Amino acid sequence: SMGGHGAFYLAFRHQDVWGAAGSMSGGLDIRPFPNNWDIAKRLGSYAENKEAWENNTVIKLLYLLDGKSLNLIFDCGTADFFYDCNKRMHQALLERNIPHDYTERPGAHTWEYWTNSIKYHLMFFDDFFRKN
């Protein structure tokens, strides 16, 4: 959810601190949701503060990535309301030749989906920490 956005946001901006980041069903583009999660309280309304929204949505921060210093994993269920923005993030990373682990599978924004998804994230991070 928004924790996935936060994890990627912090990792993208602080690659000297983070070597890997993961997101399950993440809101990787906040712009389609201008009235949700009190984001407007922090960034101002989208209509009046588009630049702030552009500067703080993860999908627009890919220019910070060199494709070498950060290991990424993310996934989303095909019935999740964040599915489209995850698919767009995957495409944008592919276009920039940035390595990442992306999975989409049946499921929605539910604990049932995340209970399955977490297993793959744990394997990813286990591999990352064993190598580093």
Give residue ranges: language-model regions.
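Non-catalytic cap/lid and distal C-terminal segments of serine-dependent acyl enzymes
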Residues: 1-132
